[in-house]
Amino acid sequence: MSLNRNDKAAVVAEVAAQVARSQTLALAEYRGLTVADLDKLRRTAREQGVYLHVLKNTLARRAVAGTAFESAAESMSGPLIYGFSEDAIAAAKVVVDFAKTNDKLVLKGGAYAGKALDVNGIKALASIPSKEVLLAQFLGLLQSPISRTARVLAALAEKRAVPAAEEAVEATADVATEAAAG
């Protein structure tokens, strides 16, 4: 089904609005994928907050014109699925992870921070841990010195408490022997 001019303008406007909110673009060729596989990919993308859309390349080029993703226009050829995300790595991660399990989805490239990325660049971007994991690791780094200090102080207190307890036991024993002798 072909789109008339108004429909095309609406598609370009919708994609351009998504592009304006996104940090990352991932491109993949979907030739040979079954409908079930595409549905699975779309479901995964939705769960991760990734806008995934099959577009005519001409419309995609118009949507990214004048944006940070314009540099990826050279990679826009063939039957492509476009993944946009506000999260810096989500789109790349969804596409790369799906391509690992399905060889018919072929990575083509993408863009991040105004720079075009090749296949290796998209894979490298996807290998970065998620924001939540990075925050957890950072929190662990912040907590590590504090917990280490607390353990040292507890060990020091225990070390000082043991001789004090032994002295108290000896003093009690001395008092008991004096009372028994006296």
From Swiss-Prot:
GO molecular function: large ribosomal subunit rRNA binding
GO terms of biological process kind: translation
Highest taxon of the lineage: Bacteria
Entry keyword set: Ribonucleoprotein, Ribosomal protein, RNA-binding, rRNA-binding
Keyword presence, Ribonucleoprotein: yes
One Gene Ontology cellular component annotation held by this UniProt entry: ribonucleoprotein complex
InterPro entries: Ribosomal_uL10, Ribosomal_uL10-like_sf, Ribosomal_uL10_bac, Ribosomal_uL10_bac_type
Protein family per UniProt: Belongs to the universal ribosomal protein uL10 family.
Subunit annotation: Part of the ribosomal stalk of the 50S ribosomal subunit. The N-terminus interacts with L11 and the large rRNA to form the base of the stalk. The C-terminus forms an elongated spine to which L12 dimers bind in a sequential fashion forming a multimeric L10(L12)X complex.
Record function comment: Forms part of the ribosomal stalk, playing a central role in the interaction of the ribosome with GTP-bound translation factors.
Protein name as it appears in the record: Large ribosomal subunit protein uL10
Species of origin: Leptothrix cholodnii (strain ATCC 51168 / LMG 8142 / SP-6)
